[in-house]
Amino acid sequence: LKGIKVIDDFVTPFIDRTLSLSRDELEKLGKSDTEFTFLHSLANYTRDPKVIRDQLIAVLLAGRDTTAATLSWLMYELAHYPQTWQKLRAEVLEHVGPDRDPTYEDLKKLKYLNNALNETLRLYPAVPFNVRYALTDTTLPSCVSGHPDISVVKGDAVFYSTMAMQRRADLYPPTSADFAPVDVFSPERWEHWQPKPWQYVPFNGGPRICVGQNFALTEMAYVMVRIAQKYSRVEYRGDWHAQIHKVEIVGCPGNGVTVALFEDEK
């Protein structure tokens, strides 16, 4: 209860301030690229402060640790593969430049950066385990020769690991000069490979797919662009191979990711 009060004390003033705006004021803000916020959008749909609070908390909590963990894993890999960092940075400087604030359109055009994010989410999905409950009786076919099919009764909990699914070598093309082993970080694989349905599900899928998927990808791409604009080199501090995968709700680097960033010499 004490923690809930801290959260409420933080978000309530923002909600009250927004609800004090008239419909005309909200409509005027909606035409601005710089002043219109998610909170203003919510106020256009409901004037119920509890509903707005719940939506804000969902975004603040679900969009914090997941994004932070993914960016940490990306920096962990980039520090180990300097040539990948240089390639990513070159793309950013070519399409955005060293100083300009990237637009949403810029972020979508940065193919190598988006490939790097996809590759990070493939190896380290933010939520590596999940559960679904069967709505009807069904049977799952066995994938192992000689083993019986699996009966699933309505109401049964089905646990699955997105991390294990996305690292199954039998679901990928054979290793080659153009396709790195499945457990190796390689944004290049996305240049000539597209996963089959349900093979790549870092945001899950179906009616319960993560509603913040595009927001998260945009946020992470923006952060990486700003870092790449300023820093020419990334070095890992510590034993890269000693890293562990810590899993609670979110899967994150158990030892943290300590890196040194070197500014571009102008």
Question: Which residue stretches match the model-derived regions?
Answer:
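Conserved cytochrome P450 catalytic core segment spanning the I/J/K helices
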Residues: 2-70, 187
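Short, small-residue alpha-helix embedded
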Residues: 66-79, 223
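Cytochrome P450
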Residues: 1-10, 46, 61, 105-115, ...
